[in-house]
Amino acid sequence: MTADVPNARLVDVELDESIGRSTPDVEHERAVAIFDLIEENSFHPVGDQKGGPYRLKLSLMESRLIFSITRENGDAVATHILSLTPLRRVVRDYFMIYESYYQAIRSATPSKIEAIDMGRRGLHNEGSQTLQARLKGKIEVDFDTARRLFTLVCVLHWRG
C-alpha cells in the first residue's frame, strides 16, 4: 500500500478544540485513540511522493469532516473534506451502544458487558470500514489506522 513512500505515517494528530470538550469517558477515548494512532499507523495522502511523516488536524464544519494534512515541518500537503452523511448512522448507533457499555461496566453482569462490547466492536469495525472506503483515493490507511481515526471522528461528532 505505502511501501514506496518514505515515512508514510502520522507523528501528530490534533482535534479541532473550538468544538469544546465532552464527558470524561469520551475524552479518555480521545486520548487513547490519539496515543495509539501516533504509536502505530499507516497513513499516506494519495499522490504525495515526498512522503511524511505527517501531521493531521481533524475538524468538523457544516456536517463535513475535514482532514488537514501537513508535513512534520508544517508544509501543507492536502486538505480533504468528506460528508458525514455516510457515517452518521453508524456514529449515532455507536454512541448509543457506547453509553450502554459504560453504564453496564458499572453494574451489569460480565455476560451482559461482553454482549454489549461485542456489539460495540462490531459497530466500530463497520464505521472503520466505511471511513476507510470514504478515504479511498484520497488517503491510504490500514484497518487499524481507520479504527483509531473512526474513534476520533466519533469524539468530534459527540462534541459537536
From Swiss-Prot:
* Residues annotated as transmembrane: none
SS bond list: none
Q: Name one Pfam family in it.
A: UPF0262
Record's HAMAP family? UPF0262 (MF_00678)
Query: Family assignment?
Result: Belongs to the UPF0262 family.
The identity of this protein, by name, is UPF0262 protein BSUIS_A0274
Q: What is the lineage of its organism?
A: Bacteria, Pseudomonadati, Pseudomonadota, Alphaproteobacteria, Hyphomicrobiales
